[in-house]
């Protein structure tokens, strides 16, 4: 059910309208208010605009809320390859090991889509569970291999991931 200001706040975030977003936040609206589709402003924000994320997070937006499809914002940002947004979310305690409804971590989604900078950051600068298997039994390495993401495969192999740690 939509909450007061949920639609306006979500709309401003989705458009990347910092001016309207700031105005609404200054009026102390509930930053975790849901819009008519049951999603928060953080969940519908323009992913390529980490400043939107930071403003919402500074006001207490919960980076680990999942939407109706089981995705947290970090899943969406990793899948879309928005490294700056992933970093902003992690600055505010987004869970790097949060699972979606299929058991995928953000690393799985970034590897599947071939987003090398996101994969590299998650592997080298977070406590990401690189060997985690989703509900189908696949690791991020398995998905990178299945989808032919050769740069991701090379990076993972260079960091000791793959081979015996993944399905053959």
Swiss-Prot record:
Tagged with keyword Aminoacyl-tRNA synthetase: no
The protein's name in its UniProt record: Cyclin-dependent kinase 4 inhibitor C
Keywords: ANK repeat, Cell cycle, Repeat
Organism of origin: Mus musculus
Function: Interacts strongly with CDK6, weakly with CDK4. Inhibits cell growth and proliferation with a correlated dependence on endogenous retinoblastoma protein RB.
Key word Repeat present: yes
GO molecular function (one): cyclin-dependent protein serine/threonine kinase inhibitor activity
InterPro entries found in the cross-reference section: Ank_Repeat/CDKN_Inhibitor, Ankyrin_rpt, Ankyrin_rpt-contain_sf
Any single GO BP term: negative regulation of stem cell proliferation
Family indicated by similarity: Belongs to the CDKN2 cyclin-dependent kinase inhibitor family.
Subunit structure as annotated in this protein's UniProt entry: Heterodimer of p18 with CDK6.
Entry's Gene Ontology cellular component terms: cytoplasm; nucleus
Per-repeat ranges for ANK: 4-33, 37-65, 69-98, 102-132, 136-165
């Amino acid at each position: 059910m939509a909450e007061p200001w949920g639609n306006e706040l979500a709309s401003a975030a989705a458009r990347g309208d910092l001016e309207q977003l700031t105005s609404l936040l200054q009026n102390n609206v509930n930053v975790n208010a849901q819009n008519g589709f049951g999603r928060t402003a953080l969940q519908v924000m323009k992913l390529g605009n980490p400043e939107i994320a930071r403003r919402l997070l500074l006001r207490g937006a919960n980076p680990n809320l999942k939407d109706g499809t089981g995705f947290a914002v970090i899943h969406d940002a990793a899948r879309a390859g928005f490294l700056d947004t992933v970093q902003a979310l992690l600055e505010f305690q987004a869970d790097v090991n949060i699972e979606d409804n299929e058991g995928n971590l953000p690393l799985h989604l970034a590897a599947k889509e071939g987003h090398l900078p996101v994969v590299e950051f998650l592997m080298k600068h977070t406590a990401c569970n690189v060997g985690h298997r989703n509900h189908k039994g696949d690791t991020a390495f398995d998905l990178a291999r299945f989808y032919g993401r050769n740069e991701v495969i090379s990076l993972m192999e260079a960091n000791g991931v793959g081979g015996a740690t993944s399905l053959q």
